[in-house]
Amino acid sequence: MIEWSDRGIVLAARPHGEDGVIVSLLSAGHGRHSGIVRGGRGKRLRAALQPGSLVQATWKARLEDHLGSLVVELLAGVAGGLLDDRDRLAALAAACALAETVLPERAPQADVYDATLALLDALAEGGEGTPLVWAGAFVRWEIGLLAALGFGLDLSCCAVSGECGDLAYVSPRSGRAVGREAGAPWQARLLALPAFLLSPAEVPANAQAVGDGLRLSGYFLEGHVLAPQGRGLPASRQRFVERLRRWSAADR
């Protein structure tokens, strides 16, 4: 019998059999990992199996490549505190679905786990009046996810001139930053680089910048990570993006 215990973030749960649930976790030390939770459709475990819940999990299986079983205990829930804020709830659903879609199974992803915990904290703390803080955190989380998957963007210096100031674009081909002046002739072909990704402590995000950031990360997630596998971005992420477009419209 193989067994491990670890903390994990619930990414998804789907019914299995009469009362069971197949749960997908992003665990601290074992990466994205799935298992069957017996009785998972009952009221006792309902809160623990909501996407975004932090749980203590014990996984057991006879062989390493078996699906195995999971026993989970709720440590902290996030979704319940977001029920009155559909934007943050949409962000939570998008993050969990995206991690479930793009992360390889059973590959340790300690940095992604830590970054996802930080995102959940930002969502939990980001009530009315601070939406752009957590929305900016979501964009930075997606950029970090790209890096963890081997498709990190190089936002250090201009790919054309080599200068490291006034960066305004990203090349869709190379994923490298391009300066404002150097990129001006090809502006229509380049992706906008929001300034808050370069200096988050100095430049606050606004609605337009968040939208640009989501287009930037979404372009590379879809084109470089998912398209080669014949897949697209999760529908929940698209719904989240649509919700945030209302912010930009309200700012006009």
UniProtKB/Swiss-Prot annotation:
Tagged with keyword DNA repair: yes
Family label: Belongs to the RecO family.
GO terms, biological process: DNA recombination; double-strand break repair
Species this chain originates from: Rhodospirillum rubrum (strain ATCC 11170 / ATH 1.1.1 / DSM 467 / LMG 4362 / NCIMB 8255 / S1)
A Gene Ontology term for the protein's cellular component: bacterial nucleoid
Protein name: DNA repair protein RecO
Presence of keyword Iron: no
PANTHER family noted in UniProt: DNA REPAIR PROTEIN RECO
Gene3D superfamilies hit by this protein: Nucleic acid-binding proteins, Recombination protein O, C-terminal domain
Disulfide cysteine pairs (residue numbers): none
Function according to Swiss-Prot or TrEMBL: Involved in DNA repair and RecF pathway recombination.
Pfam families given in the database record: RecO_C, RecO_N
Alphabetical keyword list: DNA damage, DNA recombination, DNA repair
